[in-house]
Regions:
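Short beta-strand segments at enzyme active-site cores
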Residues: 49-50, 75-76, 115-122, 154-160
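Surface-exposed cleft-lining segments at the edges of enzyme active sites
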Residues: 90-94, 123-136, 162-170
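Charged helix-capping and loop-helix junction motifs
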Residues: 30, 134-140, 172-178
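An active-site-proximal structural segment forming one wall of the substrate-binding cleft
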Residues: 92-116, 131-152
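Acidic/histidine-rich catalytic cores of soluble enzymes
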Residues: 48, 148-193
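Alpha-helical elements of Rossmann-like donor-binding domains used by nucleotide-donor carbohydrate transfer enzymes
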Residues: 34, 61, 105, 137, ...
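Short acidic/His/Gly/Ser-rich catalytic and metal-binding motifs that mark active-site loops
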Residues: 82-86, 120, 127
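N-terminal pre-domain/capping segments
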Residues: 1-112, 185-189
Length: 193
């Protein structure tokens, strides 16, 4: 029987800030770069999901490292959204605006590090009575962020889904809701494709 390489069928990746949780909480700007070097040196991985870095110089060094390592890069917005207690589907316009601005900053950071993908997520589920309204607001948020990203170049986006009723209590928890959003946004933005 011929052996088949997994690499022929998928990119094997690692979530950087989960493998190295100190990245999220460290005050040292070099922690991100130092820990990414460990991943880049491990030829098992062909992709890495990274989160935010406040230091633009570190982001540019990260980009250089990831380019020479030939790793596919996905930028995760969940540390920003969850850590900042932001809500992209907030019914309050000021609260939603804070989330939109943060997501636009995430897009800028994703371009800085050379990411091919950005992973977006919804905020808290407001409950049955306001869920449809919150979904509409979330789609508006996504359109605004995707339009913003188009100005900078080509970036692909995916939707990170969490649970609706156990821990994260996210608006977009069930897969069917994520698929509905992807179907609606895919023709114009290639979202989720």
């Amino acid at each position: 029987m011929d052996s088949v390489s997994l690499y022929a069928h998928m990119k094997l990746g690692i979530v950087h800030f989960k493998a190295f949780p100190e990245v999220e909480f460290s005050q040292s700007p070099t922690v991100m770069l130092d820990t990414l070097k460990k991943i880049a040196e491990d030829d098992f991985f062909t992709a890495v999901e990274i989160g935010p870095s406040r230091d633009v110089r570190i982001r540019h060094q990260v980009r250089q490292l990831l380019e020479v390592s030939h790793l596919t890069v996905c930028y995760a917005t969940q540390p920003t959204i969850l850590g900042g207690k932001l809500n992209p589907n907030a019914l309050d316009p000021a609260e939603r605006r804070r989330a939109v601005n943060a997501l636009k900053n995430c897009v800028d950071e994703a371009y800085d590090v050379g990411a091919s993908w950005v992973r977006l997520l919804s905020g808290k589920d407001p409950g049955d009575s306001k869920r449809d309204e919150a979904k509409k607001v979330f789609k508006d948020t996504l359109r605004e962020v995707l339009d913003y990203a188009k100005q900078e170049g080509q970036m692909r986006f995916t939707l990170k889904i969490f649970d609706r009723s156990i821990d994260k209590c996210s608006l977009i928890g069930p897969f069917a809701d994520a698929a509905e959003i992807a179907r609606e946004l895919c023709p114009e933005y290639g979202f989720g494709s």
